[in-house]
């Protein structure tokens, strides 16, 4: 995928924040839009300080808009609303949607009849970080 020079990322969780940093390191101008009060809230306490320091080092390339909600995506960027209700238009060559995950429980449960040892693990139960999902997979395997 060709990423333009001016990027808007909708969703300031760990994935969106890391994407913003990576693109900034590639010289892109990035605007990170997060509806919550802070970015990378789902990062662990060891990783987050280093991530935030890196973001600070790339402050010229990354603009962070917290308490801002994306209300529409168009060919040339997004429309969003800030905490005061002010509508903003953010121009971009590329829009990346990193606004969270929803577990696909129904798809996972459709596999239950295949085995008497069926276990749901990882993101099909609830979205989370890879270390938790791998540990849960290991625990399920040890039960079999």
Residue ranges and their predicted role:
Residues 18, 34, 136:
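Acidic-residue sensor for enzyme active/binding pockets
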Residues 16, 44, 48, 133:
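Short, conserved glycine- and acidic-residue-centered signature motifs
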Residues 132-144:
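An active-site-proximal "capping" alpha-helix that borders the catalytic cofactor pocket
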Residues 28, 48, 125-128, 135:
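Basic side chains
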